[in-house]
């Protein structure tokens, strides 16, 4: 069991009534996230990156609605101002994360794609039963991030969509046809 890891493909979308540049600036300053994102316990810079931030390594500690925390290091691997930020995680979560920002007539669509495996043995052991709960928990953390960003920017969060919500909607639509 020591080599078993559970894979997750998680996608979150926020739509905020703010220009893409303001959102991009917040996302590229993760050391400030604990001030506005409730479940970000700490972000510590381990290594500085280049002028764009590529090569930076930060250690994140996250809490959640469930009674556990996750810690991992994230290296920024690509930055395309002001539309994309990509990184590689290693630690209790390993994989890739990518922020994509798209300007809309009424604001900005922010999409986060998180392709990770879990490194905690207990999570992997319980994943066959609890994976939907872990996905729900991820959605709760991300929903709070969208609300926190909106509060911090002083703008409305116009929409939120997460992985477990989409899965639930897909099941519901099949049942109604």
Predicted regions and their residues:
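Structural motif
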Residues: 17, 79-81, 104-106
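Generic recognition of short, well-ordered alpha-helical segments
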Residues: 28, 71, 124-125
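Glycine-rich portal/gate segments that line the openings of hydrophobic small-molecule binding cavities
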Residues: 35, 44-96, 109, 144-167, ...
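Hydrophobic ligand-binding cavity/cleft-lining segments
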Residues: 1-50, 164-177
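Beta-strand/loop substructures that line and gate deep hydrophobic ligand-binding cavities in soluble
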Residues: 88-144, 160
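Conserved beta-strand segments that form the floor/walls of ligand-binding pockets within enzyme
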Residues: 9, 15, 75, 100, ...
């Amino acid at each position: 069991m020591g080599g078993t890891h559970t894979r997750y493909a998680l996608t979150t979308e926020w739509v905020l009534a703010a220009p893409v540049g303001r959102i991009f600036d917040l996302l590229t300053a993760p050391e400030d996230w604990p001030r506005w994102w409730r479940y970000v316990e700490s972000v510590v810079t381990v290594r500085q990156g280049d002028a764009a931030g590529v090569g930076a390594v930060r250690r994140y500690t996250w809490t959640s609605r469930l009674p556990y925390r996750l810690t991992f290091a994230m290296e920024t691997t690509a930055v395309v101002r002001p539309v994309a930020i990509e990184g590689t995680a290693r630690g209790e979560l390993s994989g890739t994360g990518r922020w994509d920002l798209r300007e809309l007539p009424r604001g900005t669509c922010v999409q986060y794609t998180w392709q990770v495996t879990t490194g905690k043995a207990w999570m992997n052991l319980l994943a066959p039963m609890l994976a939907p709960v872990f996905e729900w928990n991820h959605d709760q953390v991300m929903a709070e991030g969208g609300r926190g960003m909106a509060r911090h920017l002083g703008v409305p969060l116009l929409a939120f969509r997460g992985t477990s919500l989409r899965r639930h909607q897909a099941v519901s639509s099949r049942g109604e046809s």
